Each structure stands twice: as structure tokens, then as C-alpha cells.
Regions:
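Active-site residues of response regulator receiver
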Residues: 22, 68
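Two-component/phosphorelay signaling modules centered on CheY-like receiver
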Residues: 25-45
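Conserved phosphotransfer cores of two-component systems
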Residues: 38-39, 58-60, 82-90, 106-108
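Helix N-cap/capping motif at the beta->alpha junctions
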Residues: 46-55, 76
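Active-site beta3 strand of CheY-like receiver
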Residues: 60-66
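Receiver (REC) domain active-site loop signature in two-component systems and cognate sites
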Residues: 71
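Hydrophobic/aromatic residues positioned on beta-strands within the core alpha/beta folds
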Residues: 95-96
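C-terminal output helix
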Residues: 118-130, 135
Length: 143
């Protein structure tokens, strides 16, 4: 069963923002549909790779970034590292079919980790959990 209400995010005067990052357009569309269905109040943007995601992060503040791990251009690791260094207040969710290749440091730095394919309930639970974890953390910068 899906929770009916998402946790409160850092966005108090605007709709929570989610950035979806995946080089597979069908995955982006599927994630987008899940969020539209279960979290219609979220503003959802997408990036097709690490470089585009990092650029998007410089343009807007996001509450959650859900990124694939394996992508060209540094992949999800590059996105995760940019979030850790420059946007520690942003919830970080990793989504991949190759989680076995995720090193302990990156696994620890993610607020939630999802194996592909994930169910709608797992996706929403991961995003909600990541938002709650960030809300309970003191703001910090690594590095």
C-alpha cells in the first residue's frame, strides 16, 4: 500500500522538485508516470545523462534526484558526487539494474537505493524515505 501523503520537504513555499536522471527515455517516462499518479504535487524534470543533470542542478534547487547508476559520461556516480559536494541538502536516490557494482562509499552516500525494475510502491517509498532522511540530517558539505 502506498502512503497517501509524502513527507514534508525543504520546499515550503513551492512544490517539491524531483530530477529524474536516466539515459533510457522509457525509464524516464515510466518514472514520470509513477510520480504523476502518486505525487501529482511534485514538479518533475528529467535529464538524459550526468552532464545534463549537473547542468540542471546549477539552474534549479531540487528536493530529490533519482539517478541511474550506469550511464555514459560518468554516470550516476558523477551525479551523486556533484550532489554530495554541492547540494548536500538534496535527497539522493540511486536506481540501477547493476547495484552490485556500487562501491560502499556511494551506497552510504545515497539516501535510498532501488534495484531496477522497481515497483511503483518501491519507487514512492524510496523517494519518501530519502526526503525524510534529508529532513532529519543537519546540512553538511563533504570535502
Amino acid at each position: 500500500m502506498l502512503p497517501s501523503e509524502p513527507p514534508v520537504s525543504h520546499a515550503t513555499l513551492r512544490r517539491p522538485r524531483v530530477l529524474l536522471v536516466d539515459d533510457d527515455p522509457s525509464v524516464i517516462r515510466a518514472l514520470w508516470r509513477v510520480l504523476r499518479k502518486h505525487r501529482p504535487q511534485f514538479t518533475v524534470n528529467a535529464a538524459s545523462g550526468a552532464a545534463q543533470a549537473i547542468e540542471a542542478l546549477s539552474d534549479l534547487t531540487y528536493d530529490v534526484v533519482l539517478t541511474d547508476l550506469q550511464m555514459p559520461g560518468g554516470g550516476g556516480r558523477a551525479v551523486l558526487e556533484a550532489l554530495i559536494l554541492h547540494h548536500p541538502e538534496t535527497a539522493r536516490v540511486l536506481h540501477s539494474s547493476q547495484l552490485g557494482s556500487l562501491d560502499p562509499f556511494h551506497r552510504q552516500q545515497a539516501h535510498a537505493v532501488l534495484a531496477k525494475p522497481a515497483s511503483e510502491a518501491e519507487i514512492i517509498a524510496a523517494i519518501d524515505s530519502a526526503l525524510l532522511r534529508v529532513a532529519s540530517e543537519p546540512a553538511r558539505r563533504v570535502g
